[in-house]
Amino acid sequence: MPSLRGLSIAAIAAGALFASPALAHPKLVSTTPAADASVETPSRITLTFSERLMPRLSGVEVIMTGMPGMPNHRMAVTGFQTSTGADGKTLIVALPRPLTTGSYQVTWHAVSADTHRIEGNFAFAVK
């Protein structure tokens, strides 16, 4: 007959095994435009994560980091609307107008059910 100690250890190990996915942080899976891409004038930016997000606690900042003739010109892009896609895993940044030629950095933060905030950034260029 299994001992109480052995059963306890097995229960803890099984709990840890099955609880791990629930405690995982969301990971950025893909972006449009892709990181380091050079694209035509986008009218929206999307970020897809590995888990459903808490929309009120997740968001982005879009900065123009350079433009033709002014490589170190930093200017915030304003007036965009952020929403969550039907899958709950995609942040959609609807820009008020297509982005102009230059380089851009998107800084994001995301929170899922585990309530831990993760953050990161990626850059792309507009031709």
What is each stretch, according to the model?
Residues A37-E40, M54-A125:
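Acidic, low-complexity Ser/Thr/Gly/Pro-rich repeat segments typical of extracellular/periplasmic
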